[in-house]
Amino acid sequence: MRPSRRPRFRNILENRTIAAMTRSTIASFRAVSKHYGSHCALRDFNLELREGELLTLLGPSGCGKTTVLRLLAGLEIPDSGEIFLDGRTLAGVPPEARNVNTVFQSYALFPHLSVAENVAFGLRMKKLGSAEIRARTAEALRMVRLDGLGGHRPLQLSGGQQQRVALARALVNRPRVLLLDECLSALDYQLRREMQLELKGLQRQTGITFVFVTHDREEALSMSDRIAVMRTGRIEQLGPPRDIYERPANLFVAQFAGESNVLEATVTAITAPDSLIVELAGTPLTVRTDRRFRVGARLVLVLRPEDLHVHDDAAAEGGLAGHVLERTYRGVTLDTVIALDAGPRIKTSEFFREDTPALDHPPGQRVRVSWTPGWEIVLPHDPET
């Protein structure tokens, strides 16, 4: 396990994770499979959703994320396996009887109805009393900070406000599970960041289980109690964001969870239960890992760009020598592409400070790249990734 960069922050995250792990199961998928023609969208899929958590399904297009939502919502029927909600099978239960609501990417608002009428639509379909409908609609609009806009039409609102209307329309039904299908992808960057914070706040405030689908790793890492990384209809890894990012189960998860430098190496010696000497294109390196390897085994080192440091003295010991190919100023960070003498190119990302001349490495300069021992991620060689 890699040493913590921020022990206090680590404790906060771990306390939150422990709290999430003690929650009871609200819904579960058991050996669920789903095909669309010859395409297998889900295969022997297993997942438990916990009461009051925000779970994100993260993965590339076509990996089965949206199929999971559609099956839970009752919009699709599994080919095999069972889905349970509150301990009861959902087999044969129609969508309207499941107490599960979905917020879609398109929002699906009725343009001819007012904001309040859109929010109240589901309650009217349930034939609730008018007083209860008014009270619950007003409560939902306050929750998403749209009180005072109930008389407006959707087209009079901004994209972010329309998103809040869609959320209010789902929350007003007080669902057991709220499904969010890439519902932030149509927003611009700044508004998307704001809505991420609002969604987290709403989830904490209501205590409703949220299942969020995205292919955006920053959204997943910043919002979730747990993340399920999916590939070809299966979960590759399920766990808290920090585990997904810092302790990935395999190379696919490592690369999908964050920007990665991937270096192939061979084990030349085992010096301790958690320490190896590896050879990278003729360069010996000592690495730390709790995984077991034999001498001669091929493996990969995953180095996060933000974990790397660039030094002027290419002749110094330790790390990897090379020369600068490109520098990119990004305001907060300086990104550097370096061609290593060992062969591959790697990228570093360092926080930029104008009073730090050590960060000024022009193209062509000889440098050495280092990192804190133990911050490398050591994984088995995966020919499929």
Swiss-Prot record:
Where is it chiefly localized? membrane
**What's the protein's topology in the membrane?**
Peripheral membrane protein
Q: Which InterPro entries match?
A: AAA+_ATPase (IPR003593), ABC_SmlMolc_Importer (IPR050093), ABC_transporter-like_ATP-bd (IPR003439), ABC_transporter-like_CS (IPR017871), Mo/tungstate-bd_C_term_dom (IPR008995), P-loop_NTPase (IPR027417), PotA-like (IPR005893), Transp-assoc_OB_typ2 (IPR013611)
GO cellular component terms, semicolon-separated: ATP-binding cassette (ABC) transporter complex
What is the stated purpose of this protein?
Part of the ABC transporter complex PotABCD involved in spermidine/putrescine import. Responsible for energy coupling to the transport system.
Subunit and interaction comment: The complex is composed of two ATP-binding proteins (PotA), two transmembrane proteins (PotB and PotC) and a solute-binding protein (PotD).
Q: What is this protein called?
A: Spermidine/putrescine import ATP-binding protein PotA
What organism does this protein naturally occur in? Methylococcus capsulatus (strain ATCC 33009 / NCIMB 11132 / Bath)
Q: What is the lineage of its organism?
A: Bacteria, Pseudomonadati, Pseudomonadota, Gammaproteobacteria, Methylococcales
